[in-house]
């Protein structure tokens, strides 16, 4: 990413910046707009905010619309330009290389961006559903041909559950459920295969990066469901009674552990943070190897909770070629032994400038 322009975005009225390759340190006091700047870059690169599901929230107070424009080179060679406009009424327009696109998925296929914010700790300590969603997003980045599997499976599952409830009400017989049973089984097997493939690609790097960050014997695992037409048919009576499908990948969990103990339950806040950072670094490495393109990393408020050794390990663990935007309240956050920032950007009162 070489150029970013924000127009009526959050705290920024007009802002234009040239971004350096490598490590970019964004410095400023709390509330100055550092996270807003990262959010603007993410919106421009991925088509949506990492902070809110309601895009209208990015529109600056009193403005009618917000606009983000980015320029850069994908895979180090191919120029790209994006323009995202969000209107206060809720309409959003995405333009990639001068042409309107219908979905932000087209941006995600073109540009890889990984994010850490304090809220991301929910992936480690939150519900299984959060971990499943995170894993399925990794599938979209690492195995693009399988990106829609989770959505397709969810749609088939919803149809089967609706048919189960109609059967419970006596409106249909089991023949109405059968086609959706077959679809859930077929898509479930494909989704489980994709999940296992991604976990196998990420797990070794996760263990290595966690150890470097001071969390030895960390492990990433996934236990597949035994989803099949036969398994679903065996549970049909129970499923009809409950009105929901009782076996499948929608009920599985991603296991993050250290020394055989679940970090969700037994991990300290610091260990959970390290695990999330190790997961991000492992995915960045896997993406670099699988796609020959180093992703962009957006790291918000991560350095303040790490000691110097862990800061050095984190920044040193970023794969070669990654552009990293990291926020901090002080320019002393990067230790002497860590890679040096290629650029320092000072943020104050909704404006940003290169030092």
Go through each PLM region and give its residues.
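Short polybasic amphipathic segments
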Residues: 4, 66-72, 90-97, 254-259, ...
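Nucleotide-state sensing region of NTPase/ATPase domains
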Residues: 42-130, 134-146, 200-208, 218, ...
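Conserved NTPase motor "head" modules and their coupling/switch loops across ABC/AAA+ ATPases, GTPases
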Residues: 1-29, 43, 171-296, 305-309, ...
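Conserved lysine of the Walker
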Residues: 34
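Walker B catalytic acidic pair
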Residues: 300-302
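An accessory alpha-helical subdomain
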Residues: 120-213
